[in-house]
């Protein structure tokens, strides 16, 4: 049964401007070391950062907390399975909220264009 869903769009140019303005301070505040390593070895890095930003926002919406209750950006991590399929890992406060919801499965779909990153998260128990 679906216990939460979230969707989000992130503008690539907005993420790019933030990275160019704040550099590593912005990147390390938002993204996990695994996400940074993945994106930095790929082409179209700003698009990939935007899609991961959208996934984090969609995850916050899906668990129903938004920014409240101590949820942090790095509580949500986009990782890729060996097949390349993206998955959303939860850590810290977000993981505890998901446990309270009885989440057993997290479905993540992400995509990006030159202009937008998009993500959709579905939580199931």
From Swiss-Prot:
Q: Name the enzyme group at the top EC level.
A: transferase
Q: Does the keyword section mention Lipid metabolism?
A: yes
- Please provide the record's keywords in A-Z order: Cytoplasm, Fatty acid biosynthesis, Fatty acid metabolism, Lipid biosynthesis, Lipid metabolism, Magnesium, Metal-binding, Transferase
**InterPro entries to which the protein is assigned, alphabetical:** 4-PPantetheinyl_Trfase_dom, 4-PPantetheinyl_Trfase_dom_sf, ACPS, Ppantetheine-prot_Trfase_dom
Q: Name one GO cellular component term.
A: cytoplasm
What are the GO MF terms of this UniProt record?
holo-[acyl-carrier-protein] synthase activity; magnesium ion binding
- Enzyme Commission number(s): 2.7.8.7
Domain of life of the organism in this record?
Bacteria
Q: Name one Pfam family in it.
A: ACPS
GO terms classed as biological process: fatty acid biosynthetic process
Q: Which reaction does it catalyse?
A: apo-[ACP] + CoA = holo-[ACP] + adenosine 3',5'-bisphosphate + H(+)
Q: Which cofactor does it need?
A: Mg(2+)
| Alphabetized Gene3D superfamilies for the sequence | 4'-phosphopantetheinyl transferase domain
Which subcellular locations apply to this protein? Cytoplasm
Binding residue positions for Mg(2+): 8, 57
- Function description: Transfers the 4'-phosphopantetheine moiety from coenzyme A to a Ser of acyl-carrier-protein.
Q: What family does this belong to? A: Belongs to the P-Pant transferase superfamily. AcpS family.
State the protein's name. Answer: Holo-[acyl-carrier-protein] synthase
Q: Which organism is it from?
A: Solibacter usitatus (strain Ellin6076)
Q: Which gene encodes it?
A: acpS
């Amino acid at each position: 049964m679906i216990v939460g869903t979230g969707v989000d769009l992130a503008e690539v140019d907005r993420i790019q401007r933030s990275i160019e303005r704040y550099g590593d301070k912005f990147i390390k505040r938002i993204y996990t070391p695994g996400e940074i390593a993945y994106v930095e070895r790929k082409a179209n890095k700003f698009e990939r950062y935007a899609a991961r930003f959208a996934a984090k926002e969609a995850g916050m919406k899906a668990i129903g907390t938004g920014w409240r209750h101590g949820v942090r950006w790095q509580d949500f991590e986009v990782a890729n399975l060996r097949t390349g399929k993206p998955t959303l890992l939860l850590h810290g406060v977000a993981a505890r909220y998901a446990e309270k919801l009885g989440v057993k499965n997290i479905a993540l779909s992400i995509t990006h264009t030159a202009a937008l990153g998009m993500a959709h998260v579905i939580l199931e128990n």
